[in-house]
Amino acid sequence: MILLKLYLTLAAILCQSRGTTSLDLDDLMTTNPEIQNEIINKHNDLRRTVDPPAKNMLKMSWDNIIAESAKRAALRCNQNEHTPVSGRTIGGVVCGENYFMSSNPRTWSFGIQSWFDERNYFKFGFGPTRAGVMVGHYTQVVWYKSYKMGCAINLCPNEPLKYFLVCQYCPGGNVVGRKYEPYAIGEPCAACPNNCDNGLCTNPCEHSNQYINCPDLTKQ
């Protein structure tokens, strides 16, 4: 099995938050089904709004095994390095990873939106529109082939940005050679007319790293 080579996405950093918040760590734990739904719904809502539109964007769903992997990553409190590939390979599939850190607790929707907002500095097919900006979180959030994910949060008291949020995405995005084309441009669901949910495809290829005829498999 040939593993996809991935570029690691850089970590999104939120400096000292303005104002106060009533959130605490327990409010953000991803063992809570309501938090899981918030995370998945936020991703799917954003994936539906990409511009230019995507014809092959898959619908995301929650996966508890991936969430456990994200939890292990969060518990490391290593905000400077992403999890080694061996630590985020699940079922033979290499998964992508996004980090978000903040000094005060923020909602998952806030962190996910911050990743997506990197699109303001991204041009499809070209990449970053200015030097020194991060776009890898955005391209992972909207990577068309990623369809399963899990997230976790940890409190890292020895870090200035102590609230550490981690999401992992399978299969991972930011594949070498096409990371600035995270999806195929076209009318929403044009690639999956019989398997569509409000602009997102619902026919993932679970054999993506094993078979070269995956496009045919997903039509069945």
Swiss-Prot record:
Molecular functions (GO terms): calcium channel regulator activity; potassium channel regulator activity; toxin activity
Span of the signal peptide: 1-22
Alphabetical list of Gene3D superfamilies matching this protein: CAP (3.40.33.10)
PTM statement from Swiss-Prot or TrEMBL: Contains 8 disulfide bonds.
Domain ShKT: residue ranges: 205-220
UniProt-recorded name of the protein: Cysteine-rich venom protein VAR5
Main location: secreted
Function (record text): Blocks ryanodine receptors, and potassium channels.
Keyword Disulfide bond: yes
Annotated family: Belongs to the CRISP family.
Compartments, record wording: Secreted
Top-level taxonomic group: Eukaryota
Keyword Isomerase (UniProt): no
Coiled-coil blocks: none
UniProt domain SCP: residue ranges: 41-169
GO CC annotation: extracellular region
Keywords: Calcium channel impairing toxin, Disulfide bond, Ion channel impairing toxin, Neurotoxin, Potassium channel impairing toxin, Secreted, Signal, Toxin
Entries under Pfam families matching the protein: CAP, Crisp
Disulfide bonding pattern of the chain: 77-156, 95-170, 151-167, 189-196, 192-201
Tissue and organ expression note: Expressed by the venom gland.
